[in-house]
């Protein structure tokens, strides 16, 4: 059995695990990622996905003259997801997500070379009760596979990659 020693242990080499590892390496921490698969297959379910990402008041929405806001997105999310303050952490998480997704996700990945098809998708509109009131789903150019490949490559080529162990 291999033994690892690091400041941070991350379970799972999906997108969240890869991004967490990148951030930890940036912070000077040593990192071990433990996954059921080999590093070449990291990316989790995102690697197999169509690549849709939910952003609020994004540059692509503004270019298309789609007026959106975190308040509007949260109202839509609560309607479609049937969330209320009684849902506690899920409700709070959804609120923070719509407030921060463009700045903390979109603006994090686009400098890495991730781009989006110039068409916004309007999913989860709701059949029996209202859902998204404007298009918010951005499709990664190259699908989720491209997202996983770009992030995985950034991880493997990181300046502190010697502080990274994959198990």
Describe the predicted segments one by one.
Residues 1-5:
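A short, basic/flexible loop-to-alpha-helix module at the beginning of a structural domain
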Residues 48-53, 136:
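Short, hinge-like loop/turn segments at secondary-structure boundaries
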Residues 13, 36-37, 57-58:
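Active-site-proximal beta-strand/loop segments in catalytic clefts of secreted hydrolases
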Residues 52-98:
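Glycine-rich active-site loop/strand segments that organize a redox cofactor
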Residues 19, 29, 38, 101-102:
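Proteins synthesized as precursors that undergo proteolytic processing into mature forms
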Residues 6-33:
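N-terminal Rossmann-like FAD-binding beta1-loop-alpha1 element of flavoenzymes
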Residues 26-47:
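Glycine-rich FAD pyrophosphate-binding loop
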